A protein has these predicted regions:
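Outer-membrane beta-barrel proteins and related beta-barrel translocases across Gram-negative bacteria
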Residues: 1-471
Length: 471
């Protein structure tokens, strides 16, 4: 008798368990005209634990092409999560020895990383990386069936990291950015862009102070730094680029120093000194080629230090005046009227950094076709990342006079209490005089007034009077 006997070839075994399972991934097969028959997307899945897995795949073609890839997901609860993908392909199209035979190596990297905001209040890391060589999607068989991926013209990647050392007030933050144009294989990369910040501290303050505070203990300073390194190039030239000659880099420092002192118990003195330094790896010297009637640029590589500084000092005090209204006229409602006068004067100075002794500005003679000669001024550091100090000397004296008038009256809600009423919250005048200016050194006179008429309503007005309007 014909008794049906069921026969089956096991294709895969998937046990239903509560734990993660590792196992083989069966490949798919097919035929691709340029690369031949293939087995692809076969490999092994590693269920390492409930926080991390790994999938390894491979592909091979009968005409010599092959590729491997690795994909991983990770997740640590309340800490971080992300995914990573890497693929490498060695693609050979056509038959070896024939004129249309081509061989290309390409790869792709994707990385996404997210950190929980509560994981570490002092440090953070985030990443969104999507990098691929320009030929990768054209050689990837999966992309042929995904027009959106195949026609993608730009890719962007970024990684950012920051940390804070609260005990010393130091903060670091860094980013790396990459932009790709897949059509012409151009790359714009910044690696790294680092910011350093040191919060205000008092370098001369004694750890174990005894007695009154010394004047030098009131001197404070801070620091900010910025390091940047960037390049615009082609994909195949990136790994062969020279850090000094091909990359655009620099380091900028800023150090403000200040203090606050009291003179004769009534006058507040506040000096300050600001220093900025720029470090570059090259400069561009310019000259004029009279025969060709064009400017000639000569790039000189080496360490270049470009700095500038400024200083200032200010003095201010407060003068108080009181008026007790006559009770016969005003009764006992108004207790007193107070007038506070705050005069201040400040002086700021910065030298002329276009002077020849600094070397930040140069000149050359340009001989025109008609025989006339012009003197051209330029800066060898004009196109650098952090610029060049400005031209011109500064010597400025500023004056300011501020008035405040308040009235102390009995509170209608409390028979034993008093409250303050603002009559004139501020009435101020300010003007400055530039000693370095060759003409019109006096600035305009600025007057400002602020009145608080009601609890939530403030009136502000500013008027400017031109010092040389009738000159």
């Amino acid at each position: 008798a014909d008794v049906p006997l069921p026969l089956a070839i096991p294709y895969g075994f998937f046990p239903f368990t509560k734990s993660y399972s590792s196992g083989f991934i069966m490949p798919t097969y097919g035929d691709e005209s340029a690369r031949g028959f293939y087995l692809r997307d076969g490999g092994y899945y590693f269920a390492i634990n409930d926080k991390w897995d790994l999938k390894l795949l491979g592909e091979i073609y009968t005409k010599g092409s092959w590729g491997v890839s690795a994909a991983s997901n990770y997740n640590k609860r309340y800490r971080y999560s992300g995914s990573f993908y890497f693929s490498y392909q060695d693609t050979k199209n056509g038959d070896k020895g024939m004129p249309d035979f081509t061989s290309q190596k390409s790869f792709k990297i994707q990385w996404n990383h997210r950190q929980d905001q509560k994981a570490n209040p002092y440090s953070s890391l985030s990443a969104s990386v999507n990098f691929a060589t320009s030929s990768y999607e054209r050689n990837n068989l999966s992309s042929l069936y995904n027009p959106q991926t195949l026609t993608q013209s730009t890719r962007t990647s970024s990684v950012s990291w920051s940390t804070t050392f609260s005990s010393i007030g130091l903060s670091l933050s860094s980013t790396a950015n990459l932009s790709q144009n897949m059509r012409d294989s151009s790359i714009a990369m910044t690696l790294p862009d680092l910011n350093i910040s040191l919060s205000r501290f008092y370098p001369f303050k004694r750890k174990h102070a005894a007695g009154d505070e010394r004047w030098y203990e009131k001197i404070s300073m801070s620091y900010t730094g910025h390091i940047s390194n960037s390049i615009n190039t082609k994909e195949d030239k990136l790994l062969h680029s020279n850090l000094i000659k091909d990359w655009r880099n620099g380091w900028n420092h800023s150090i403000p120093i200040s203090g606050n002192f009291t003179l004769f118990n009534y006058i507040n003195i506040s000096p300050s000194f600001n220093f900025q330094d720029r470090m570059y790896t090259h400069k561009v010297m310019r000259s004029w080629d009279a025969a060709a009637q064009r400017e000639v640029c000569d790039t000189i590589y080496g360490f270049n230090n470009v700095y500038n500084y400024s200083m200032s000092i200010g003095a201010s005090t407060k003068l108080y005046g009181f008026y007790m209204p006559s009770r016969k006229i005003f009764g006992d409602k108004i207790q007193a009227i107070r007038h506070v006068l705050t005069p201040s004067v400040s002086f700021s100075y910065a030298p002329d950094f276009s002077a020849s002794r600094y070397g930040y500005y140069k000149t050359y003679q340009r001989t025109n076709a008609d025989g006339s000669v012009d003197l051209v001024e330029y800066s060898p550091y004009k196109d650098q990342l952090f610029g060049v100090p400005g031209k011109g000397k500064t010597g400025n004296i500023a004056f300011d006079l501020s008035n405040n008038v308040e009235m102390k009256v009995k509170s209608s809600k409390d028979s034993t209490g008093f409250k303050k009423l603002s009559i004139i919250d501020e009435l101020g005048l300010s003007m400055s005089y530039n000693m370095a200016a060759k003409e019109k050194p006096l600035s305009d006179l600025t007057m400002r007034i602020r009145l608080k008429w009601w609890k939530n309503y403030t009136f502000n007005m500013t008027a400017v009077f031109a010092s040389y309007a009738y000159v």
